[in-house]
Amino acid sequence: MAWENQTFNSDFLLLGIFNHSPTHTFLFFLVLAIFSVAFMGNSIMVLLIYLDTQLHTPMYFLLSQLSLMDLMLICTTVPKMAFNYLSGSKSISMAGCATQIFFYISLLGSECFLLAVMSYDRYTAICHPLRYTNLMRPKICGLMTAFSWILGSTDGIIDAVATFSFSYCGSREIAHFCCDFPSLLILSCNDTSIFEEVIFICCIVMLVFPVAIIITSYARVILAVIHMGSGEGRRKAFTTCSSHLMVVGMYYGAGLFMCIQPTSHHSPMQDKMVSVFYTIVTPMLNPLIYSLRNKEVTRALMKILGKGKSGD
């Protein structure tokens, strides 16, 4: 196996996004600011949902899992990128690269499946309100969430192990700010066509299958909302679902854009920009979208800060 012919001392070089020009230095600190907002926002969401018993519902449990995944995702890539930029070092060990690929792919895959579960939750809440507590009881909700983590992690293991079964006999410079398998495949001196097909199949499973569930769920939700007699009920349903659809659109738009193209057609700059969007920008926007458009989250935050009223 090619792995046996490589040592963990054979480091890769992450070329990153930024150089040390004034413009790029400004952009680097902008990314750090976005990271800080994303880190604090998702941490607050997890803590709020854990601490406030009124948020102990399936919808908010799933939202806390999404925030946890986003929190882990940004911590997988940004700290290493920042360390390399500030220290002037570009190296990452093979073990470090394998670990980064595992968490990176696992978390992206897990989010795909979790977003599908969240859409099913909204479907049951709006279309089957009388059966909601039974259909989304804690055991079922926990199992669906666990399967999201397991399926995503399985894909991460496959990609991490398969990617490092190749030999790297030329340049070890990765034209990215993190270890990303399309960038690594370019460096391999093996025929990667079969593995590219495997990647495409994984993308189908991780993206198209969950998207089908989301589209089906929201098609039924829209029909149910149209037939609602109460204007207040329509408004509440629209507000809740539109927040989720905004997140789905941002996340799947970038993911589908990356996956529908063969690896050989990827350009380094294109990969970097799209990756920055769904690994740094989207995790920052998710808690803002849900908190600004959700009175219960806002109330919980005010209560924790001591500004809420106990009778609210």
Curated annotation (Swiss-Prot):
Keywords: Cell membrane, Disulfide bond, G-protein coupled receptor, Glycoprotein, Membrane, Olfaction, Receptor, Sensory transduction, Transducer, Transmembrane, Transmembrane helix. It is a multi-pass membrane protein. The keyword Transmembrane applies. One of its GO terms (cellular component) is plasma membrane. Its main location: membrane. Disulfide bonds join 97-189. Residues 50-57, 121-139, 220-236, 293-311 are cytoplasmic. One of its GO terms (biological process) is detection of chemical stimulus involved in sensory perception of smell. It is found in: Cell membrane. InterPro entries: GPCR_Rhodpsn (IPR000276), GPCR_Rhodpsn_7TM (IPR017452), Olfact_rcpt (IPR000725). It comes from the Eukaryota. The chain crosses the membrane at residues 26-49, 58-79, 101-120, 140-158, 196-219, 237-259, 273-292. GO terms for molecular function: G protein-coupled receptor activity; olfactory receptor activity. Belongs to the G-protein coupled receptor 1 family. Odorant receptor. PANTHER family: OLFACTORY RECEPTOR (PTHR26453). This is Olfactory receptor 2M7. It comes from Homo sapiens.
